[in-house]
Amino acid sequence: MVIKTHRNFDKQFAKLSKKQRKKVETSLALFMKNPHAAKLRCHALTGEYSGHYSISAGGDLRLHFRYLSSDAAISTAVGSHAQLYN
């Protein structure tokens, strides 16, 4: 799996603490190896975020992404549940 990042993701990622950035990096590495790993709790989003998916990076930290193809995705957002859904 190839992962690209959207500029919004890059800005949000830069604002995370060092510990949170490490969790995101670990989750992205796992996602590249196995996008359907149970630990990621990957699921499709609905409504305003239809076409996007969410994975868990631990605790309340979430990553949003869209599939570009069967082997490529773009990370579009990262943050807590409240930051992403409000």
Which residues does each PLM region occupy?
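Arg/Lys-rich, positively charged N-terminal/basic patches that mediate binding to nucleic acids
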Residues: 1-28
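General helical structural elements
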Residues: 25-27, 43-45, 66, 70
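A general secondary-structure junction signal
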Residues: 7, 44-46, 59
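Residues that form or immediately flank small-molecule/cofactor binding pockets and catalytic motifs
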Residues: 8, 50, 80
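A short, surface-exposed loop/turn module that caps and links secondary-structure elements
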Residues: 30-55
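Enriched for short, Lys/Arg-rich terminal
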Residues: 2, 11, 22, 56-62, ...
